[in-house]
UniProtKB/Swiss-Prot annotation:
Heterooligomer composed of large and small subunits. Bidirectionally degrades single-stranded DNA into large acid-insoluble oligonucleotides, which are then degraded further into small acid-soluble oligonucleotides. Transmembrane segments: none annotated. GO terms for biological process: DNA catabolic process. Keywords: Cytoplasm, Exonuclease, Hydrolase, Nuclease. It is found in: Cytoplasm. It comes from Bacillus cytotoxicus (strain DSM 22905 / CIP 110041 / 391-98 / NVH 391-98). This is Exodeoxyribonuclease 7 large subunit.
Length: 451
C-alpha cells in the first residue's frame, strides 16, 4: 500500500479545525500569571499565561482590550476568558482572550490605583467640574438596588426630612458582571428626564469585589458626563471608590447622602418663623418711626402757618426775578463792551493793511537783493580776470612764444637731460605752432665750466 504524506500546513490546519470545532475550547476560563507582556502600537496585547507547570501564548486584540479596567503587567495574576486556536505560522496553539480581570484582592487594588491615577491626570476629579447641589431639590433620583437597606434608608430619611420632596427610584444591579452597565444606563436615563434636580448613586457596604462596579471606568465617565449633580453614597464611611472621586459630592453613607440631598423641613420652618418674627419687628419699628416723623411734621411751622410760608416764598421769588433781570442787563453790557473791543482790534489788524505793509517790505527786500547780487558778480568778475592773467603768465604756450619748446622721448615722456637721450633716438619737439619729429645725430653734454 502506497504511503500518503501530509504537508506541515495540511496537518496544522487539520489540528486547528479539530480545536476550533471543539465546543469545550471555544469558551474557556483560565487563570494564571502574565509574563512577556507586550503592547503593540496598534493596540493589541501579546503575552504568556503561565502557572507552576505550564504556559500558553495569549493574544488580546484592541477591540476587546479597550474596555478592561486595568493595565496588565508582568507578574500580575489574572482571570481570562477566550477561545483556543492554532497559530499556523508557528504551529503553536494559543488563547485569543475576549475578557480579562484581576485575580485576587491585591490585583483589584492595583487596578483601582491605576484607574485612579489615569482619571485624575485627565482632570475627572478636579473641583473645576464639580456642580453645586441645589439647596431645595423638588425631585430626587435614587440609583441603587431596589432591595436592601440602602434604598430603605434613603427614602426614609428623605420623607422624614423633606416630605414634600418627590423620589424617583432607578433600580439597578449593584454588583456582578452586569452591574456597571446597569448603573450607566440608569444615569443616562435620568439625564434624559427634565424634572430631576439631584441624583444619589450608591449602595450599602461590602467587600472590594462587591463594590467593584463603582470602580469601573464606564461608571466614572457616566457620572462625570451627567448634567444632573450627583451625590455618591457607596459603602461605609471608610470605603472610597472611583465614583466618590468623580461625583459632585461624596457622602459617607446612603443615609448621609439623603441628608445632603434635601433640607430639613423642620429647620426650614424654624427659619421661616424666625424670619417672620424679624420681619414683623422690623415693620413695627418702621411704622413707629414714620408715625413719629408724621407727628413732628404736624407740629412744624409749615403745617401750622402755611399762609405765611407761601407769602415768604412769593417774596423770595420776586427778589429772585429782580436779581435775574439785573444779572441779564449786566451780562448784555459786558458782551457789548467785549464786542467793541474786538471790533477795534479787527480794524487795527485788518488784512488789507497787513498786505500793504508786507508788499512794501517785499519790494525793499527785492531791491536790496539786486544790489547784493550785483556786488557779488562784480567781485567774482574781478577775481576771475586776475586769476586768468596769472594762469596766462604761467602757461607753457606763453613761454613757447618766446622761442622755447618741449622735447618728448619716443615714450612720450618730457626730456629734462641729455643723459636721457642717445644718438639715433627719435625725439619730438613741441613748439608754439606745431611738433617737430627729429633724429638725434649726436649727444654733447655741457662741460663743468659751462661750455
Amino acid at each position: 500500500m502506497e504511503k500518503q504524506y501530509l504537508t506541515v500546513t495540511a496537518l496544522t490546519r487539520y489540528i486547528k479545525t479539530k480545536i476550533e470545532y471543539d465546543p469545550h475550547l471555544q469558551s474557556v476560563w483560565l487563570k494564571g500569571e502574565i509574563s512577556n507582556f507586550k503592547y503593540h502600537s496598534r493596540g493589541h496585547m501579546y503575552f504568556t499565561l503561565k502557572d507552576e507547570n505550564a504556559r500558553i501564548a495569549a493574544v488580546m486584540f484592541a477591540g476587546h482590550n479597550r474596555n478592561i479596567k486595568f493595565r496588565p503587567e508582568d507578574g500580575m495574576k489574572v482571570l481570562v476568558k477566550g477561545k483556543i486556536s492554532v497559530y499556523e505560522a508557528s504551529g503553536s496553539y494559543q488563547i485569543y482572550v475576549h475578557d480579562m480581570q484581576p485575580d485576587g484582592v491585591g490585583n483589584l487594588h492595583l487596578a483601582y490605583e491605576q484607574l485612579k491615577v489615569r482619571l485624575e491626570e485627565e482632570g475627572l476629579f478636579s473641583r473645576v467640574y464639580k456642580q453645586p447641589i441645589p439647596a431645595y431639590a423638588k425631585t430626587i433620583g435614587v440609583i441603587t438596588s431596589p432591595t436592601g437597606a440602602a434604598i430603605r434608608d434613603i427614602i426614609t430619611t428623605i420623607k422624614r426630612r423633606y416630605p414634600i420632596g418627590n423620589v424617583i427610584v432607578f433600580p439597578v444591579l449593584v454588583q456582578g458582571e452586569f452591574a456597571a452597565p446597569s448603573i450607566v444606563q440608569a444615569i443616562q436615563t435620568a439625564n434624559e428626564m427634565n424634572d430631576i434636580d439631584v441624583l444619589i448613586v450608591g449602595r450599602g457596604g461590602g467587600s472590594i469585589e462587591e463594590l467593584w462596579a463603582f470602580n469601573e471606568e464606564i461608571v466614572a465617565r457616566a457620572i462625570f458626563a451627567s448634567k444632573i449633580p450627583i451625590i455618591s453614597a457607596v459603602g461605609h464611611e471608610t470605603d472610597f471608590t472611583i465614583a466618590d472621586f468623580v461625583a459632585d459630592l461624596r457622602a459617607p453613607t446612603p443615609t448621609a447622602a439623603a441628608e445632603l440631598a434635601v433640607p430639613n423641613i423642620l429647620e426650614m420652618q424654624e427659619k421661616v418663623l424666625q424670619r417672620t418674627l424679624r420681619l414683623q419687628r422690623a415693620m413695627r419699628e418702621i411704622v413707629h418711626k414714620r408715625q413719629e416723623r408724621l407727628q413732628t411734621l404736624q407740629k412744624s411751622y409749615a403745617f401750622r402757618y402755611p399762609r405765611q410760608i407761601y407769602e415768604q416764598k412769593e417774596e423770595q421769588l420776586d427778589r429772585a426775578l429782580e436779581q435775574l433781570v439785573l444779572a441779564k442787563e449786566r451780562y448784555m453790557e459786558k458782551k457789548v463792551n467785549q464786542l467793541k473791543q474786538l471790533s477795534f482790534y479787527l480794524e487795527k489788524h485788518h488784512p488789507a493793511q497787513r498786505i500793504s505793509q508786507t508788499k512794501i517790505a517785499i519790494e525793499t527786500l527785492q531791491k536790496q537783493l539786486r544790489r547784493e547780487m550785483q556786488t557779488v558778480l562784480q567781485t567774482k568778475e574781478f577775481a576771475f580776470v586776475r586769476i586768468a592773467k596769472q594762469l596766462e603768465a604761467l602757461s607753457p604756450l606763453k613761454v613757447m612764444m618766446r622761442g622755447y619748446g618741449l622735447v618728448y622721448s619716443e615714450k612720450n615722456q618730457v626730456l629734462k637731460s641729455v643723459k636721457d637721450v642717445s644718438a639715433g633716438d627719435v625725439v619730438s619737439v613741441q613748439l608754439q605752432d606745431g611738433i617737430l619729429d627729429c633724429n638725434v645725430s649726436s649727444v654733447k653734454e655741457r662741460e663743468s665750466n659751462g661750455k
